[in-house]
């Protein structure tokens, strides 16, 4: 919940901070991330093997954006994850993708309930046959500032 004081084992946690929206938002995003982790096989099935992770792009230092794929045992469980590590929104950002299809946003840390703006929500997104990041397909997404978005291919 965003404890603002250093932890002290002799005192209780500052639970009263949950009365403030930013602190409540931190609690909600951590709760949602835990639920997301438990519900998405790609996040836990192959977490200790190299085949469970594949970089899409780790070289975009200019925009401070990283993107990667987390892989489950079944290709339908794979997740495309994109992180914007700056306070600047990245609108119309192109991401290389492994295959053709429609992507559905399955997690966005910028939702209003997380004390985010709620402005940069990606609906269903079609891939195009446009080479990017050494891949045959790509799409354009909006990435909120200081946020992580995750996508899955629709079946």
Identify the residue ranges that each predicted region occupies.
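Carbohydrate-interacting/catalytic domains
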Residues: 1-155
């Amino acid at each position: 919940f965003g404890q603002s004081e250093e932890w002290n084992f002799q005192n209780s946690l500052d639970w009263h901070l949950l009365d403030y929206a930013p602190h409540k938002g931190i609690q909600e995003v951590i709760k949602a991330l835990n639920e997301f982790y438990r519900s998405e096989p790609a996040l836990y099935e192959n977490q200790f093997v190299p085949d469970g992770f594949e970089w899409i792009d780790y070289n975009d230092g200019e925009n401070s954006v990283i993107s990667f794929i987390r892989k489950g045992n079944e290709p339908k469980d794979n997740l495309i994850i994109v992180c914007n590590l700056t306070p600047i929104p990245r609108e119309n950002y192109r991401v290389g993708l492994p295959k053709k299809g429609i992507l559905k946003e399955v997690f966005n840390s910028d939702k209003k309930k997380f004390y985010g703006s709620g402005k940069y929500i990606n609906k269903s997104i079609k891939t195009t046959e446009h080479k990017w990041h050494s891949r045959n397909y790509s799409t354009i997404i909006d990435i909120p500032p200081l946020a992580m978005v995750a996508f899955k291919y629709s079946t």
